């Protein structure tokens, strides 16, 4: 597999649909990790794109929650609690004792669990949204294909946020 100079896996130019979706999702997961690399704890907690309170550490925590929601709750139908507790259901809130290592470990555990849950599933297999979630989508059933495309979109959008935050912190751009 080819990688970018910063170590992210380059998605193949030609592949079957499943391989392509997984590769792009992995690329965007790796992009978020790159955006957080080399920073100190106080920098990861810095809300650097005013007026937003979003931080790089909060984004990592949020994506752990997003991974859990879409692969465990929606696709596999599991009743699992929020990754970082009921009072932090979206993952954005920071806790003074939790740094990047703990947040990344939780995020990577959620990524691994999601991979396990979809390993033998087909792209047309469906998960089930709550009525509230279905109101946004228009249907309570969503295919694994839909979930994977949504996850790519979710990471791409938040990686754009991470770009802005990182640039404000130390001037690093790209990736």
Swiss-Prot record:
It holds the Pfam family MST. InterPro entries: DinB/YfiT-like (IPR034660), MST-like (IPR007061). Keywords: Transposable element. The keyword Hydrolase does not apply. The keyword Phosphoprotein does not apply. This is Mini-circle uncharacterized 19.1 kDa protein.
């Amino acid at each position: 597999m080819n990688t970018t100079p910063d170590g992210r896996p380059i998605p193949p130019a030609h592949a079957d649909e499943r391989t392509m979706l997984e590769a792009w999702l992995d690329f965007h997961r790796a992009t978020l990790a790159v955006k957080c690399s080399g920073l100190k704890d106080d920098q990861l907690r810095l809300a650097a794109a005013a007026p937003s309170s979003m931080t790089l550490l909060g984004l990592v925590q949020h994506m752990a929650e997003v991974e859990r929601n879409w692969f465990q709750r929606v696709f596999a139908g599991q009743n699992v609690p929020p990754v970082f507790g009921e009072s932090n259901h979206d993952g954005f809130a920071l806790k003074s004792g939790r740094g990047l290592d703990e947040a990344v470990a939780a995020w990577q555990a959620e990524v691994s669990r999601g991979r396990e849950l979809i390993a033998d599933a087909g792209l047309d297999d469906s998960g089930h949204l709550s009525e509230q979630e279905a109101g946004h989508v228009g249907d309570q059933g969503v295919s694994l294909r839909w979930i994977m495309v949504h996850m790519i979109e979710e990471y791409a959008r938040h990686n754009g946020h991470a770009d802005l935050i990182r640039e404000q912190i130390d001037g690093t751009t790209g990736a």
